[in-house]
Amino acid sequence: MSILNVEHLSHGFGDRAIFEDVSFRLLKGEHIGLVGANGEGKSTFMNIITGRLMPDEGKIEWAKKVRVGYLDQHTALEKGMTIGSVLSSAFDFLYDMENEMNDIYARLGDVDEDEMNKLMEEAGTIQDMLTMHDFYMIDAKVEEVARALGLLDLGLDKDVTDLSGGQRTKVLMGKLLLEKPDILLLDEPTNYLDVEDIEWLKRYLNDYENAFILISHDIPFLNSVVNLIYHMDNKKLDRYVGDYDKFMEVYEMKKAQLEAAYNKQQQEIKELKDFVARNKARVATRNMAMSRQKKLDKMDVIELAAEKPKPEFNFKTARTPGRYIFQTNGLVIGYDDPLSSALDLEMERGQKIVLTGANGIGKTTLLKSILGLIKPLSGSVTLGDYLEIGYFEQEMDQSITTTCIEEIWNEFPAFSQYEVRSALAKCGLTTKHIESQVRVLSGGEQAKVRLCKLINRETNILLLDEPTNHLDVDAKDELKRALKEYKGSILMVCHEPDFYDGLATDVWDCSKWTTRL
């Protein structure tokens, strides 16, 4: 049974086409991985099929009474919202029904007997609906899901703006679970999730009987949960049966076959053109030349897609620092309450350290405390000599209205326009991206702009807070290569063992010193 039909969909921004004449069917129970490079339009596609964005052309048709749950990259959680209020908002439609029922009861004293009977019948129908949906057990349901996701210990009255990125993702995921939609749309759900949360999500999706569409650049995760791949590339959407590894096998084979056919056809075209050029003027061979020209005119010429710009990340290294990068003495990190026991840590020159552990235990807070962005609750941090620090934050400020060019120029005012454009292009951004406002780019493209700032500044210590979030496969592979070759030291928060394996000299498990477990 078809849950969703998309026919002849085309969309773009300005003169930049994102996709053209895309058609797509979602069937009951399909577990789909939607893949493609950063900026190919995956999140845009999700926004269109959920009605958040109107397409330039095409038709989107959902089956009747289908409830859609959508977890996107940039869902707004505003100050004043609590964990409990966000989870309870999954039942807003039931609260609306309760309000409608209460309004009916309020009107009963002002109507005649016939009207009263009608209203009572209407109120009874609503009451039955509320009972059927377990309306009077909402608090218990919210508590059950919060406990399963490890949110109950944080407190249901905790403001969502005080949560870590992973904790916010879990709150939004919990809301989806409570909504019990007929289809899940998940846009990079593993960003900010720790290893245990990702394992939990794997189990949940494997047991999920309904359909889902999943955007992810986490290949092991994709391989474990999907049975179909839709590849968004060069404004088209192609379907492949199997997991990501099977898709890559078939995709590379098709690509090689197309290139072989292209080369063979180009050789044939060259020979035909040579024959026509040599023989069209001679009376004896003119007819043969005309025949060859007709063959050329009728030929369906194979076109190869232009190669996507691949990023090149090469970090510049500053002078050698002193022996110690930093030392802490009785350091207790946190905001109002402590997140750690007293820490006596030290990092030496040349170490490449990865911080691991569950969400919300203080990994980002530790980075910010070392940098002096947050004052410790007690204890001290001593930075080493001759440090040139590069810092990569989890997210970019979405209120920024500058273009990519302006963003880099503000950071490096001595650069010429050519140097700015060249620096951005080396990070895998096209001319259209470079001239766009940063905030309209995809999460992966924004990350590349921030990496552009980092690699063009001389550093000898990098503090990286989940740098792989949003990056596509090519960008991740290139970043890993660049960090392995980097001559300086690295302190990095990362939840992807595949990324830091072979890169890290040390792994610090922050759960050993946190007060939150």
Each PLM stretch: what is its role?
Residues 1-260, 309, 318-517:
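ABC ATP-binding cassette signature C-motif
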Residues 250-300, 305:
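Intracellular alpha-helical coupling/juxtamembrane segments of multi-pass membrane proteins
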Residues 313-315:
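Post-kinase regulatory C-tail/linker adjacent to protein kinase catalytic domains
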